[in-house]
From Swiss-Prot:
Organism name: Yersinia pestis bv. Antiqua (strain Nepal516)
Name of the protein in its database record: L-arabinose isomerase
Role, per record: Catalyzes the conversion of L-arabinose to L-ribulose.
A Pfam short name: AraA_N
EC number per UniProt: 5.3.1.4
Cofactor: how bound: Binds 1 Mn(2+) ion per subunit.
């Protein structure tokens, strides 16, 4: 999955005609060098496109209008090389609906102490122009990001790359379609929510489809296509004896392949990039989709169990953010605890649906075993563990008057003991700052039992995603204390009530 190839970020230099053509030409010459260097040496995920210098209100407004309607443009990155009077930007910024990044840099890294004169000062005063631009953003209450640092600095490169990933995720959010196969699990609260409010806030649409709509596509899958897919399984995974040729669960594997092909075709035909299932809505399917869901997640689809459309959408968005990064991202659920002094652990898993992108094993184990829920035939699934390393769990919840993005930083650990009787994929982690504080804070904040678990995407990206959408962001990490966390929730409640 490479969602960045067709995307671009516009690099825009603001100035004014007061400087004269010679200075403005020097500004553009410097801009060409900066953009070429960033594109070729900074490892950015999205290409920068240098736009013509803007020096008048009409030019700025025209450029912002063009950015809004250019589907390749996922955001604008500005550099105030000189001074650009910010009243000129009001018209353009008032209509801009793409993410905005102010790169507070300058062409020279160090001051030429022996030769610096006023001509040099007037040409290289980002320190001056950047503050003017920042004021108008603050005055207009417009969300925009600021990154300060020299354009050859590696930390600046990393932060620009993070911003690009989040800008791409926002673009994906605005065009995302989520399919719900069946409805919400009966009587479950947190997986519900206001889909209209979500579409207004994030842009993605959520629509339900009767399970019969999916079954019709599944039943139309040919035997030849099933055989071809099973050959792919055999090349990709380790098989238990039960699912090998002539094994007593081989037919279950063939049924799972049929379901995967049918689901894939349904999603592709509808342009869906995220979906949900529900074990209470399986009429016409021979088994709960497990293997199919796992493989679709690995291909970049978002997924939520029991009709959880918010988690499905969030998973797709994090898949986009994490494209090309080390580590995977999966649907997850806190399942059970290990209470032990000095070694409190959480086992995360689900009935079947954990994404192989987080697998430690090069070839996960493919098996068919009994599932005591759903009332269907034994489903196929991939079984694996997760490598040690930093990770996070994220949950998007509907608080009625706002959406809340809740994140807990965790440390994934190696599985300390074999689990010979647990036939599902899993991840094991230590929650920051401790299991007790993390669990209590999560529960107090109303965090869902479903999460998006990621070893690829970090806190900074999710905080920025929340800022871009104007939603609440709460973080549980090593710096969290419960009194301060509770106070933050109280203050946020007041802020969002007043800011409606």
């Amino acid at each position: 999955m490479d969602v960045f190839k067709q995307s671009e970020v516009w690099f825009v230099i603001g100035s004014q005609n007061l400087y004269g053509p010679k200075t403005l030409q020097q500004v553009m010459d410097n801009a060409h060098q900066v953009v070429n260097s960033l594109n070729n040496e900074a490892g950015l995920p999205v290409k920068l496109v240098l736009k013509p210098l803007v020096t008048t209100p009409d030019e700025i407004t025209a450029l912002c209008r063009e950015a809004n309607y250019d589907t390749a443009c996922i955001g604008i990155m500005t550099w105030l090389h000189t001074f650009s009077p910010a009243k000129m930007w009001i018209g353009g910024l008032s209509i801009l609906n793409k993410p905005l990044l102010q790169f507070h840099t300058q062409f020279n890294a160090q001051i030429p102490w022996k030769t610096m004169d006023m001509d040099f000062m007037n040409l290289n005063h980002t320190a001056h122009g950047g503050r003017e631009f920042g004021f108008i953003g603050a005055r207009m209450r417009q969300q925009h990001s600021v990154i300060t640092g020299h354009w050859q600095d590696k930390e600046a490169h990393q932060r620009i790359g993070q911003w690009m990933r989040v800008a791409a995720a926002k673009q994906e959010s605005q065009q995302l379609k989520v399919a719900r196969f069946g409805d919400n699990m009966r009587e479950v609260a947190v997986t519900e929510g206001d889909k209209v409010a979500a579409q207004i806030q994030f842009g993605y649409s959520v629509n339900a489809y009767g399970i019969g709509d999916l079954v019709a596509v599944v039943d139309a899958v040919s035997k030849g296509d099933i055989d071809t897919l099973v050959e792919e399984y055999e090349a990709t995974y380790r098989f238990t004896d039960a699912v090998k040729l002539n094994g007593d669960k081989r037919e279950n594997l063939l049924d799972a392949a049929r379901i995967e092909l049918g689901m894939t075709r349904f999603l592709e035909q509808g342009g869906f990039k995220a979906f949900t299932t529900n074990f209470e809505n399986l009429y016409g399917l021979k088994q709960l989709p497990g293997l199919a869901v796992q493989r679709l997640m690995q291909q970049g689809y978002g997924f939520g169990g029991e009709g959880d459309w918010k988690t499905a959408a969030l998973l797709r968005i994090l898949k986009v953010m994490g494209t090309g990064l080390k580590g995977g991202t999966s649907f997850m659920e806190d399942y059970t605890y290990n209470f032990q002094p000095g070694n409190d652990l959480v086992v995360g898993s689900h009935m079947l649906e954990v994404c192989p992108s987080i697998a430690k094993e090069e070839k996960p184990l493919l098996d068919v075993q009994h599932l005591g829920i759903g009332g269907k035939a034994d489903p196929a699934r991939l079984i694996f563990s997760t490598p040690a390393g930093p990770a996070l769990n994220a949950s998007l919840i509907d608080m009625g008057n706002r959406f809340r993005l809740l994140v807990n930083v965790v440390d994934t650990v190696e599985q300390p003991h074999p689990l010979p009787k647990l036939p599902v994929a899993r991840a094991i982690w230590q929650a920051q700052p401790s299991l007790a504080t993390a669990a209590e804070a999560w529960i107090i904040a109303g965090g869902a039992h479903h999460t998006v678990f990621s070893q690829a995407v970090g806190v900074d990206e999710l905080r920025l995603y929340a800022e871009m959408h104007g939603i609440e962001f709460l973080l549980i990490d090593n710096d969290t204390t419960l009194p301060a966390f509770k106070n933050e929730i109280r203050w946020n409640e007041v802020y969002y009530q007043l800011n409606r």
